[in-house]
């Protein structure tokens, strides 16, 4: 498949469907390993940040299959098993987003795959392993969720801030973010519908796209955490920026994603936190 063809809508759609199958296969591997998983096989990358052989096995599988689909693309991956140099397009892969959830048998956790060219996100696929939901989008094509034979378009919710369900995640860099999360909870607790923390950036974004959450904010995260989900939110009618309010968020470490209606309120809060 030639690079220039990727900008044709049908080519993007067809490639997205193929990436969904890759994500499902990786998800099936993760699901099967969970039944015999032992915490003794967990490694600590940093404080409160873990990796298992399952993360690495999933990444190896995904990288191999994506190379077959698009040999000319490079990779940005969480576990660093594949790299990039001067390729025009890059796969951005989180082989298991929500590793801590996985270790504890606590849903959700997911496979996240995006394709980018420069600062443009062309494809986003997130497969939630427990519920077997595949969320996906391609640039200009809308966003969808598929479970079994059932496929539905995604649309963000319509709640205003007083009724909104917010997701305020806790990143691994807890010392740096502790004063921020305290201020955010103080600002919103009792002033919104409710607040959740779900342990997966990719799934928080997909839940915003599906209208299950109205907003999500997190800092000190990697591109692999948010890239696929960000496109899904935008294609579902939502808004995504960094903590500074810039729409150019793809090289940063912060994300604010909302239904649009509550964006300015949440953005003001994170700026002042």
Give residue ranges: language-model regions.
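N-terminal subdomain of lithium-sensitive/metallo-dependent phosphomonoesterases centered on the IMPase/IPPase/PAP
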Residues: 2-96, 247, 261, 268-271
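Hydrophobic/proline-rich hinge and linker segments of small-molecule sensing/allosteric domains
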Residues: 143-146, 166
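An extended, acidic
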Residues: 154-273
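Short amphipathic alpha-helical face segments that pack within enzyme cores
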Residues: 61, 110, 228-231
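Short coil/turn connectors at secondary-structure junctions
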Residues: 71, 87-88, 119-122, 162-163, ...
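DPxDG-like acidic metal-binding loop motif
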Residues: 85-144
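Residue-level signal for inorganic ion chemistry
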Residues: 30, 55, 66, 99, ...
